Amino acid sequence: MPLMVQSAPSTEAIQLPKTSESAQLKRIRHTMSHVMAMAVQKLFPKAQVTIGPWTETGFYYDFDTPEPFTEADLKAIKKEMVKIIQQKLPVVREEVSREEAQQRIEALGEPYKLEILQGLTEPITLYHLGDRWWDLCAGPHVETTAELNPKAFDLESVAGAYWRGDETKAQLQRIYGTAWETPEQLTEYKRRKEEALKRDHRKLGRELGLFLFADPVGPGLPLWTPKGTILRSTLEDFLKQEQMKRGYQSVVTPHLARVDLFKVSGHWQNYREDMFPMMAEDDEARGLEQGFVLKPMNCPFHIQIYKNELRSYRELPIRLAEFGTVYRYEQSGELGGLTRVRGFTVDDSHLFVRPDQLASEFLSVVDLILSVFKALNLKKFKARLSFRDPESDKYIGSDDVWEKAESAIQAAAETLGMDYFIGVGEAAFYGPKLDFIFQDALDREWQLGTVQVDYNLPERFDLEYVAEDGSRQRPVMIHRAPFGSLERLIGILIEEYAGDFPLWLAPEQIRLLPVTETVLDYCQQVADQLRAIGVRVQVDCSGDRLGKLIRNAEKAKIPVMAVIGAQEAESETLSIRTRATGDLGSLTVADLTKRLSSAIAEKLPHL
């Protein structure tokens, strides 16, 4: 139940700070979550508190309550929060022993906090709001509620959430809020959120008839309609053509494999919690070693194709490419339209290269990714060098191998003069990555293309090639995916374009609008000529008045409309209208065909 207001045009130029860049904003939001919890427990004494962190746009807190919160409850909670803020309560940090913390929590009857305490190491810290309320928390916070602006926050919605993200545990009530440093920032945030709701790919995807989710199929498993399938196929065909120019070879691999394959790759040991459960083969008595799992990644399959024969140094680089569907067991609460699904298609490719080819092939992959972004008119992006966290044990391979791979990626980024930043802990478990972070029309960030250098999987699978001197040498692998995930890309494109796809990408590129039934035969003749050159065209045979025909085409966001009446049929012309530029006047079929062919081939946004 989002609570939104119409913003004023004067806020257009406001730059919203990001939590990651503003320590004060982080403190404001973290303290605001505590203020909200204090208000909730005053108004609803039976509510038990769990966790309440800051987020990139605000904060939330999870509560265990006898009854769900209502819209009226949110208003009352917000009003109470304003009272707490205006009291200018000091926010005091206190260190206590584990025993002291346990005694205090037990005295309050807070079982969730007691469970949290069990997983903490000393010193245990508490944060107090005045002398009336405290929370088990590591901070940071503001020093007093006087630093919180009562006109710069709002409570937005209530949602269900499972304790610890575990569907088998208690379902809680999560209240989401947003908080900023100034009222102007709050107004601008709400304006952007309202625009985001208009662009929401779930809403537009339904209205434009592109995809759907069905309960009998299951959550996170999208179904693609004919129009949505055209959109997917157009993107796939585009990338396949670009890959063919660069010497890629297409392969096809199955959707599942024996678990042993993923034990060798390390996925079973390091990625198992994100994989679907194992399926037993025929008779469970044959043992779990014979079990099958849905693939979470395509790389082990491409490795098997490489290993099928002994390779010569002359054959390398070998570039294997596949639009392969993979499966990740995302929690239901983490699913979100097309951007977070359980089954998705990756534009995957794995390059097997000699060490002396690594730099040039890496640069070539980056060039491909940049050309894809250009064709899609995705202009605002930055590069993240995703390196391992040396303090974590979730990675495979030696320090030397990791340092070599990370150095190769950083050298490539510097050679290209890229604006990059390093993301420690963002690497895949088997190797570092160069990730492209796209910033959309609403300044939200999404990870799209990625390219990875991998010395580990060639070692684990004992990959070899025959060198020029006859010795057996180890190739280096490059993993790359310009789109990242086809589903996520389409979700992002729907929102970036607000459903107004560029002409070359639109599922329906032109709609013919007959003014009377007497011109239907002529419309079908024109449609046949356009289809013959690959143009996606439909004839509106509904019989509605012209005004409604145009409105329906506008609502469906068709790039080009051709109005055809008796005069056009007699002169064998069409009256052309586009969404982007309005009326183009009268064109012959030959002229329209020529202009459409040229615009689509050049991937122009409109006619």
Swiss-Prot record:
Belongs to the class-II aminoacyl-tRNA synthetase family. The gene is thrS. It comes from Synechococcus sp. (strain ATCC 27144 / PCC 6301 / SAUG 1402/1). Binds 1 zinc ion per subunit. Catalyzes the attachment of threonine to tRNA(Thr) in a two-step reaction: L-threonine is first activated by ATP to form Thr-AMP and then transferred to the acceptor end of tRNA(Thr). Also edits incorrectly charged L-seryl-tRNA(Thr). Its EC number is 6.1.1.3. Its cofactor is Zn(2+). One of its GO terms (cellular component) is cytoplasm. InterPro entries: aa-tRNA-synt_IIb, aa-tRNA-synth_II, aa-tRNA-synth_II/BPL/LPL, Anticodon-bd, Anticodon-bd_dom_sf, Thr-tRNA-ligase_IIa, Thr/Ala-tRNA-synth_IIc_edit, ThrRS_anticodon. It catalyses: tRNA(Thr) + L-threonine + ATP = L-threonyl-tRNA(Thr) + AMP + diphosphate + H(+). This is Threonine--tRNA ligase. It is found in: Cytoplasm. The lineage of its organism: Bacteria, Bacillati, Cyanobacteriota, Cyanophyceae, Synechococcales. Keywords: Aminoacyl-tRNA synthetase, ATP-binding, Cytoplasm, Ligase, Metal-binding, Nucleotide-binding, Protein biosynthesis, RNA-binding, tRNA-binding, Zinc. Zn(2+) binds at residues 299, 350, 479. It is an enzyme of class 6 (ligase). Gene3D superfamilies: 3.30.54.20, Anticodon-binding domain, Bira Bifunctional Protein, Domain 2, Threonyl-trna Synthetase, Chain A, domain 2. The keyword Ribosomal protein does not apply. Homodimer.
